[in-house]
């Protein structure tokens, strides 16, 4: 059994971003999935990039501009975002609030390509 508050995990700055932190919530013994909590402070961003693996995301708090492929969204609390493998995407917390979301991925090898 495993139950911990998501605010109690170690947060690390995400390289090549502005005002973005990540915390891995999944216990290390899980060999199938990884759940991460990502926080973009107001004015923060993650630049345009692709990943070899898909992402499934659930917005916990705030509002942000999210671009997936050619589509731009104003993502907000309660939204679910699916990002297929290999599709470019970026995030910008530009609506006067921090933006927090869960990002679920598999444990397959990933490769990030900055665009």
Placement of each model-derived feature along the sequence:
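Short, conserved beta-strand element in jelly-roll/cupin
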Residues: 39-41, 51-66, 104
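Structural motif
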Residues: 63-65, 72, 88, 98
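Conserved short histidine dyad/triad with adjacent acidic residue
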Residues: 36-51, 85
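Short acidic-glycine-tyrosine-enriched beta hairpin
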Residues: 70-86
